[in-house]
A protein has these predicted regions:
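Polybasic/polar functional segments that serve as interface/processing modules
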Residues: 1-84
């Protein structure tokens, strides 16, 4: 488990994201869609199939991209909200 300091805001992208995208592309999405600097907050992107998420986080030292794939089940979709 990677410790996340208290006070870090977590943003969940609605809809689905192309999971082939890397750190720079996802950071650019955050900048263009939310008009936010991606440094300091944690951003979660869900894949189309629902069993994979990518997590983008800058901890002050550098950008990290984490991936989690479920063996069974799917991550919750927030499709009723506006995608960013």
């Amino acid at each position: 488990m990677i410790p996340i300091p208290s006070g870090v805001r977590v943003w969940i992208a609605t809809g689905h994201t192309d999971m082939r995208r890397g750190m720079r592309s996802l950071a650019l999405t955050v900048q263009e869609s939310l008009k936010r600097d991606p440094h300091g907050d944690l951003y979660i992107f869900r894949g189309r199939s629902g069993d994979l998420v990518n997590i983008l986080w800058h901890d002050g030292l550098g950008m990290s991209l984490y991936a989690k794939r479920l063996d069974r089940g799917k991550f919750i979709s927030y499709g009723l909200c506006q995608p960013f």
